[in-house]
Swiss-Prot record:
Keywords: Endoplasmic reticulum, Membrane, Transmembrane, Transmembrane helix. Pfam families: MBOAT. GO terms for biological process: negative regulation of N-terminal protein palmitoylation. It is found in: Endoplasmic reticulum membrane. This is Protein-cysteine N-palmitoyltransferase HHAT-like protein. Its main location: endoplasmic reticulum. The lineage of its organism: Eukaryota, Metazoa, Chordata, Craniata, Vertebrata. The keyword Mitochondrion does not apply. Belongs to the membrane-bound acyltransferase family. HHAT subfamily.
């Protein structure tokens, strides 16, 4: 019943045909809806003039995307280009000092952007966690880290500390929350690693060099301290062919930015959900496509942002966390995350520490609850985040409960009688149901509870059985294609390992 079970080529071809046709049909419905709603009064704030020579308006509902790649694009490019230039000069002249150069440039960038008082505020938090690390008590470091994080997420702490920022500008809140929150996680990682390795005697300078690395400072991704320290301490030697991969990644990120810009001139996927009266008139296929595309866009946004940052980090001879796994390939709650760096941090210091190998029910429940408590604090406590955390925590545990149930009793006997191909089909069907649970649970936080209720009601209640079964079958086809991709990768990895053994 393993991952290497193959299906007939004709069957996979049918799945590809069905999935392609369904996506094209849903896309056409969204395109028509976007054209019909372009001049609605409710769309005026978030659908602005775009390609006037083609008569196309543009969806600008995502404040962060507009800020990053329109208003503040030149500032971001200038700051990162300066970092790359000085890093290259330092690597050529004094490679042993490059980590200091990273820190000095990062500190200057933070002071120039947010002001000296904001820098002093962050240094205060760094000092608190550094002193805690000297005591060698893991629980104390984690408790102080969470308390420090809470001070940036709830009042009165957040109101008081936001006053340390000098000046006002459009991206100020985003930079404040990003820089502060990531600083706390990095300092907590430093403290926990110091407790885990008391023989290594990390210094305050190591913490500052780690925290003020500019490409990761405001938006992440976060690297745990042990990985960053090990990589930045190595001699900067670039493997053969790596520069080509860096250029390819940079080109891919640029192409994705252009593709999103083009997409938003034709599909108003972020604006339509805000007008429930208009969204409720969409055909079922277009509504399902709208829900799916909202999650895909969030993944693309994360992949582009981390792709740009990771390109700079790779030029600095670092191996940063990879972009998140595409939502299209997710049919298991255990693999669902939109920030691989945060996911790695949570797994290392909370989830795996409590849950062990995640094979027993009670430790897994305790580990997942603790993980989502920290995640709730990271995202900022509010009703929507509470609901999102409860739903995803339930989904993660429900998978284990179903797995345990399937391993014993009648279900295990039934599966044992099935062929490997039929077992794969049954599991793909379960994966299709899980896929839509993942979409619904995350749509709550990415969009709104009201829009999620509309989608659920249309796809499950009023659309039953035709729409429900049609969407489920299309999703089943997609899951089978994802499984086939996973099978191919597993075979390639096995062949690579066999070649290494022969060599």
């Amino acid at each position: 019943m393993g991952i290497k079970t193959a299906l007939p080529a004709a069957e996979l071809g049918l799945y590809s045909l069905v999935l392609s046709g369904a996506l094209a049909y849903a896309g056409r419905g969204l395109l028509e809806a976007s054209q019909d709603g372009a001049h609605r009064k409710a769309f005026r704030e978030s659908v602005r003039p775009g390609w006037e020579y083609l008569g196309r308006k543009m969806d600008v509902a995502d404040f962060e995307w507009v800020m990053w790649f329109t208003n503040f694009r030149n500032v971001i490019v200038f700051a990162l280009s300066g970092h790359v230039l000085f890093a290259k000069l330092c690597t050529m002249v004094a490679p042993q000092l490059r980590s200091w150069m990273y820190a000095v440039y990062g500190v200057l960038a933070v002071v120039g952007t947010m002001g000296p008082w904001y820098l002093l505020l962050l240094l205060g938090h760094c000092m608190v966690l550094y002193v805690a690390s000297l005591l060698g008590q893991r629980w104390l470091c984690l408790a102080l880290g969470l308390a420090s994080l809470a001070s940036f997420k709830v009042d009165p702490g957040i109101s008081w500390q936001s006053g340390f920022v000098t000046g006002t500008f459009d991206l100020q809140d985003v930079l404040f929350h990003g820089g502060s929150s990531f600083t706390v996680l990095r300092c907590t990682s430093f403290a926990l690693e110091s407790c885990a390795h008391p023989d290594r005697r990390y210094s305050l300078a190591d913490l500052l060099k780690y925290n003020f690395y500019l490409p990761f400072f405001f938006f992440g991704p976060i690297m745990t301290f042990d990985r960053f320290h090990a990589q930045v301490s190595q001699e900067p030697v670039r493997p053969e062919g790596e520069l080509w991969h860096i250029q390819a990644q940079a080109g891919l990120s640029a192409a994705a930015i252009v593709a999103v810009d083009v997409f938003f001139h034709f599909f108003y996927i972020l604006t339509i959900p805000s007008d429930l009266k208009f969204a409720s008139r969409l055909p079922d296929s277009a509504l399902a496509g709208l829900a799916y595309s909202n999650l895909v866009y969030d993944w693309v946004k994360a992949a582009v942002l981390f792709g740009v940052v990771n390109t700079v980090a790779r030029l600095d001879h670092l191996d940063p966390p990879q972009p998140p796994k595409c939502i299209t390939a997710l049919y298991v709650f255990g693999e669902t995350h939109f920030d691989r760096g945060i996911n790695d941090w949570l797994c290392k210091y909370v989830y795996d520490h409590i849950g062990g190998d995640h094979s027993t029910v009670i430790p897994e429940l305790a580990a997942s609850v603790a993980t989502f408590v920290v995640t709730t604090l990271w995202l900022g406590p509010c009703d929507i985040v509470y609901l999102w955390s409860v739903l995803n925590c339930f989904g993660l545990n429900f998978e284990l409960w179903v797995q345990k149930l399937a391993e014993r009793g009648p279900l295990a006997q039934i599966e044992a009688r099935l062929s490997e191909q039929m077992s794969r089909r049954v599991r793909a069907l379960c994966g299709a149901v899980n896929f839509w649970a993942i979409i619904m649970y995350n749509l709550v936080s990415l969009n709104s509870l009201e829009f999620t209720e509309l989608v659920a009601r249309r796809l499950i209640l009023t659309g039953f059985p035709q729409t429900t079964l049609a969407v489920l079958f299309v999703t089943y086809c997609g899951v089978q294609l994802v499984k086939e991709r996973e099978r191919s990768l597993a075979l390639e990895e096995e062949q690579r390992q066999d070649r290494e053994k022969l060599e």
